[in-house]
């Protein structure tokens, strides 16, 4: 594994209209980095949440990145090489369709994944997906 990830969710009890956040505390291994959003074509570390009819996603909150200099290519790109936190904000919709979907089951499953490509100073490794899921109680 190229990094360690600890996930948490702000609440496991949901009601229509409630806002939630999923936090991903990421620590790259020594000499490793992952790509941050920026002006490059590398695979950015990304939060993907499986679509649900009762869920609205906000853009992922990314912390400030560092510039990594690839000496062999004389290329500078935005990366994370130190511990950082990604936060995915979500809203449980308060619509008739959302209420109907939420009424069918409790607990409900919120699932997704963290996708990234890790590199060290010599090699970029195959893209990786780390699945995450939470059981949410509907009130």
Walk through the language-model features, giving the residues of each.
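Extracellular/lumen-exposed scaffold segments
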Residues: 1-139
């Amino acid at each position: 594994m190229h990094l360690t990830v600890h996930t948490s969710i702000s609440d496991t009890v949901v009601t229509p209209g409630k806002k939630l956040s999923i936090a991903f505390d990421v620590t790259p291994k020594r000499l490793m980095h992952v790509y941050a959003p920026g002006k490059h074509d590398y695979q950015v570390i990304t939060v993907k949440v499986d679509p649900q009819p009762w869920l609205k996603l906000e853009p992922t909150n990314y912390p400030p990145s560092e510039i990594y200099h690839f000496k062999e290519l004389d290329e500078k790109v935005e990366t994370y090489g130190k511990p950082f936190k990604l936060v995915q904000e979500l809203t449980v919709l308060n619509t008739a369709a959302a209420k109907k979907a939420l009424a069918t089951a409790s607990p409900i499953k919120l699932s997704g994944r963290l996708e990234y490509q890790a590199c060290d100073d010599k090699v970029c490794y195959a893209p990786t997906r780390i699945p995450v899921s939470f059981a949410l109680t509907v009130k």
